[in-house]
Amino acid sequence: MLKLHTPMSISQTERFREIEEALRKSWCRETAYPSLQAAWSEGNPALGQCTVTALVVHDHFGGTFAKNLEHNHIWNILPDGTEQDFTREQFVGDVKLIVDEILNRADILEGESANRADTKRRYEHLRWRFTIAGA
């Protein structure tokens, strides 16, 4: 289910496969966006995981974050300009995601919306589960 937006080296692709596998093992109801926790299931494990997943990926690769306002969706823009979205699969059908905003880490972890979404706690929980999963 690897979602690469531009070509990259085989070693980087392999690392992304490892990360994707660890993320899939790490996602859970508690790491999902609060209003989506009741709908979260193992059938759609990426549901509500975009922000915290993008933060974990940022821990390993750096870069910035892309945000689509229509779907309130966040994914990574790596330092080389490659866009990487490990949670794209949560959307059913042909959903077009355009970059409406470029964010930095502070934009995501601070502020009223981060507090309402309990972003820091969910991120720390996912980061802990991700470490245990072995990535």
Which positions does each model-derived feature cover?
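A structural boundary/capping signal
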Residues: 1-135
